Amino acid sequence: MKVRPSQDWHSLLALYWITSFVEGLGVSQIFAFLPNRLTEVGVPSADVGHLVGLLGSLFFLSGLPFIPLWGVWADKYSRKAVIIRSALVEAVVFGVVAASQAPWQLFVGMMLVGFQLGNTGVMMAAIRDVTPGHRLGLAMGLFAASSPLGFGTGPAVGGLMIDQLHLSSGYVFAVAALLSIGVALMLAIGSGEVRPEVVPTGSILRLAFGAVRGLMADPTVRWLFVVYGVVFIGRQMATQYMTLLVHAVDHTAFDVSGAVGPVGLAVIAGAALSPAGGWISDKLGFRQVLVGAIAGLALTFVAMALVPSVIWLDVVYGLAIACMTIVGAMVSSLLATEVPAQRRSATLNLIYLPLYFGGITGPAIGAGVVGAGLRAVFYVAAGVVAVALILAVAFARRTGPAAQGVAEDSLPPRPADRVL
């Protein structure tokens, strides 16, 4: 592993935190203001609900074939280059969305999103390689909070621009494009190259297929990816339709964004709570906190379908964001501590493979369910997360040391090894 001496884990974490924050800010604005943008380019209001779900699936579908390739390219050649690539493509995506004048142009912009993804797992792998083991839970918790904080800031800033400055949503995405260019410059100047403990050799395709096969060979990884994938299906159902729920509860039209801004602030508050999950997991264990966070997420989705006002919706959604962020941090920490070094980097690079499947499946299910009523989407999302909860409990009981016949006192004191 080669790390620039002047850049310890604190500085690398800070740079990657900013990178993830800005990406979350821009992506959240696509989720929050996609209804606005659709109406601005001429889509009838009656068609917006179905198109939101279909475009949400398109968001991830285009990038699915590249998932294993980004990680292989990063480990074989340069993690830094792959991360900078993501920021530059973000700038192009947000620029196209900002400049769109017709629905087909907006569709093209959404297709390009698939080429910007694939950086989060690479950043997590680099953080894992430079962070001391006893600070890993905290580091992963802090990093996991960056994207949700961006997700909260994006709608808040965008709502201010649209309602107070009377700008179109195109200007919102133009600012996101400029911020992404700034991130690319920041990484190029300020970040060092962190090489994996084991640098892969061989052809790109062989390594990519090998990384995917490696996931299937490890029971812990299989369980975690299934659990995470089911959580993401429910999460993406709710996230894709959150803006529409806000407008429904607040009884506002799609061209008004004032109610979306406070939801963004709720996301910020929820994300700010999430590092506490990392701290608690260092004390109690990753498995326990994972199960608790998934249970909390299912309850919040039910509550979101029942709340009578935007204020209560803000509160509940903030709690949902905290739970979602903690789930991600716990999955990352379990993979970082329990996967062997020779496969750890490849596994972390693929950590958002479940996000792609959830991102395709969740909005597609939502597009089918929304015909029965908007709140039905959130009830179904809660049911999906409840399935993930059952799987998480089974994972915790079947993959821990006690389930494998290993005495607890014979193991080093690692929180991830404690079972329910």
Positions of the model-derived regions?
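Symmetry-related core transmembrane helices of the 12-TM Major Facilitator Superfamily/SLC fold
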Residues: 170-188, 377-394
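C-terminal transmembrane helical hairpin of 12-TM major facilitator-type secondary transporters
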Residues: 287-331
